[in-house]
Regions:
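Surface-exposed, charge/polar-rich loops and edge strands
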Residues: 1-416
């Protein structure tokens, strides 16, 4: 059963919420961040390399130092202000007319090590350590991780009633995506206490997005424990910031692939080779979207094709083997195109479905890439099944949208 707690969040005044909050550090590069950052944007804190001209190496010591300076400046200028009491917070997001309702909370670092916070991706040590360094220097979780939890009717009712009966503290539409962000401070102590009690009966949380931030936060907690002879387990550094959503409200969108070449084959040879494991149907020049699991779109030489994996080419009882990313990797990328390692190969790139299949067409038509594959999205249930069985998804399998804004609320464990 998971352990959570409310916290005294650091957050912008209402009139600055849209300007201070920003997209997460890992969805835009330094040049994009520099162009997007206004004077008070959190990007100056989470991507502080943009404050140097020319843009500095993000791992340079002066960059980490600048992040600390900027966080202090934002607080000194009252662009970020700490709440006087501990709360849970409702953070809702609207995309394409659909709203999902999360709870901003502090999660317990030991739940990560004990497996109650379940992951589905591998992490890279160097990325963990970069995030760790920021957390340790700031003594804060500046950016939340994105978790899912098994649906709970009482939590759903608490959130729905609070939203209905209380005006949002923030309510804004964020550029450049145009998604709505809505935020309530839960100021009723009885409700906050009840949320803690209910989550104590929830068996697990699932990392949806933010595996490196989660690992980094858990490592910081463990490191602080080991260096504190008087550690009790109740210290603020034992907790880290997450926004946690009911699993049924989340949607994973497609995460597609583009390849540079056909491994020496002509178009005709490649299409013929595909017929061994797929039913191949030409679809013409109109964009074709995969219609169901095990159905893929192929864009090649100005034409779209439907590829449907034949029965027997995947195992319905294998939570990893049944994934379309695995089917495509095994039967096409590996067998036909000799692309063995998706993490290191320079012959493949990945395109989040938020960009649409038009982006795949553009990458191929420009001559940059030879072919594109669009996949049917993974379901939340597939993600949960994989995490529950201790398996790891292949690289670049899940893309969640909308992303959480960074700086809507921050958790600090600075106990000075």
């Amino acid at each position: 059963m998971v352990k959570i707690k409310p916290f005294a969040g650091i957050r912008p005044p209402k009139e600055l919420a849209a300007e201070v909050s920003s997209r997460p550090y890992d969805v835009l590069n330094s040049q994009e961040a520099k162009a997007e950052a206004t004077e008070r944007s959190l990007l100056h804190i989470i991507k502080p390399e943009i404050d140097f001209d020319p843009i500095a190496d993000e791992h340079d010591e002066k960059v980490y130092k600048k992040a600390v300076e900027n966080f202090k400046k934002w607080r000194d200028n009252k662009w970020l202000v700490q709440d006087g009491e501990e709360h849970y917070y409702i953070y809702a997001q609207t995309m394409n007319g659909r709203t999902q309702y999360g709870l901003a909370m502090c999660c317990y670092y030991e739940d990560y090590w004990s497996g109650k916070i379940k992951k589905h991706e591998l992490t890279r040590i160097e990325k963990e350590e970069d995030r760790m360094k920021h957390v340790e220097l700031q003594q804060a979780n500046l950016e939340p991780v994105f978790f899912a939890y098994p649906d709970n009717d009482e939590i759903n009712k608490i959130v729905a009633d609070y939203v209905k009966n209380n005006k949002a503290d923030y309510d804004f539409t964020a550029a450049p995506e145009g998604f709505g962000h809505h935020f309530w401070v839960i100021r009723d102590k009885k409700i906050n206490d009840r949320i803690t009690e209910i989550f104590a009966g929830i068996p697990a949380l699932y990392v949806a997005d933010g595996h490196h931030r989660t690992a980094a936060a858990a490592r910081v907690g463990k490191k602080r424990q080991e260096s504190n002879p008087n550690h009790t387990g109740n210290e603020e550094y034992c907790y880290f910031l997450a926004v946690t959503f009911p699993a049924s409200q989340l949607r994973i969108i497609d995460y597609n692939r583009v390849v540079k070449d056909l491994n020496g084959m002509t178009t005709e040879q490649f299409l013929k080779a595909l017929e061994k494991n797929f039913t191949v149907e030409p679809k013409g020049k109109e964009i074709y979207h995969p219609s169901k699991l095990h159905n893929f779109s192929l864009y090649l030489d100005g034409q779209w094709y439907s590829l449907t994996a034949k029965p027997g080419t995947y195992d319905d009882n294998d939570p990893i083997g049944v994934l379309d990313v695995t089917v495509l990797s095994n039967l096409v990328l590996d067998q036909l195109l000799d692309i063995k390692d998706l993490r290191t190969s320079k012959r493949i790139d990945f395109v989040g479905g938020i960009r649409g299949l038009e982006e795949l067409k553009k990458r191929v038509d420009s001559g940059e890439m030879k072919a594109a594959f669009a996949l049917y999205p993974v379901s939340m249930q597939q993600l949960i099944d994989i995490a529950d069985t201790g398996n790891i998804m292949p690289p670049k399998t899940t893309w969640f949208e909308p992303k959480l804004r960074s700086g809507v609320v921050i958790h600090t464990f600075d106990e000075k």
